[in-house]
Amino acid sequence: LQQFFPALQRTRMIPAFLGPQGSGKTTGERLIGRLLVGQDFDVTGVQREREDALIAAITNRVMVGLDNADSKIPFLPDALARYATSQRYQLRRLYTTNEECSFSPRAILMISSRDPRFNRPDVAERLLPFNFDRPRAYRPEFEIFSELEKHRGAVMGALLGRAAQIADALPEHPPKPLAFRMADFGSFGERVSASLGGGSGSWIELLGRLGKAQSQFASDGDGLVAALAEVHHSENIIEMAVVDLFHKCAAVADAKGFLFPRSCQSFGQRLSTMRRVLEIELGVLFQEKRGHGGLRVVSFIPRNGDDGGDGDAFSEKDYERG
């Protein structure tokens, strides 16, 4: 529904359809695309050396469904992050020496993958991950899409009716500050939830679950997170110098066969990059300071007074502290 309020989504969440081959990811993208723009919609691939093609698509189309983004495409994480923040694309006009042109992203972007390589933490925080499993039985696509066409008018009518109700109610519910990075999405959902009489609690609970799903996506296959989780849970670490933590985690990673940073410097940089993921996965507040002689020290403070072992999502109080 936020798509009907462009002024309230300067930042954009990207639906990500994730799952094994044959789980219906492509069909899911096609269903949403056909619902919103009609039966001519179809998904498109993303090519390793064709960032210009992606820019052209998201600055000209109404909807773009990137399908099977499985291989490592160097520009894709940055492209997703730029799209999510609605950055204008500044390009040199073709066949000129120094003439610039700019384009704004306008499409609703979706992406699907069975082996995502775009799970950088800053990108993961901008995704709406939807996990798919293979069904027990398959239906032909023409049957699925025929059913959609029969009900498309009624569904779109209901969506537009709900959008009108929300537009009338939003002025009565001013936005609140929330501890959720994609503030436009978080604030819009909180205002809608409040306008429906449900209060903020249910929406904030959903944001907590979303944050957990995003952190799991970002940490999937990450040896640093896996090694640090083992060390933290086994030794209940509260505070430790980064160099000592590196050696402990490196020993676990070596024993378990995890991919792990080779140097303490790289380890320290990754700690900073993965800070938000570590907080959610370990259920802690991650803090750092400089000790004697400039030694970098990190702290893992149990959240809400517990031991942080379950890594549960944030509470309503956490989200509203702003």
Each predicted region: which residue ranges?
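P-loop NTPase catalytic core of nucleic-acid-dependent motor ATPases
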Residues: 1-60
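DNA transaction DNA-binding modules
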Residues: 21, 66, 71-72, 147, ...
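Conserved catalytic/switch belt of AAA+ P-loop NTPases
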Residues: 37, 77-101
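Short glycine-/polar-rich loops that comprise or flank the Walker A/P-loop
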Residues: 39, 60-62, 87-90, 105-108, ...
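AAA+/SF3 P-loop NTPase mechanochemical coupling elements
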Residues: 53-59, 93-112
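Conserved AAA+/SF3 P-loop NTPase catalytic/coupling segment centered on the Walker-B
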Residues: 62-85, 116-125
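Structural recognition of the conserved hydrophobic beta-strand(s) that form the central parallel beta-sheet
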Residues: 65-67, 92, 104-113, 129-130, ...
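Short regulatory helix/loop adjacent to the ATP-binding pocket of P-loop NTPases
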Residues: 114-128, 133, 140-141, 159
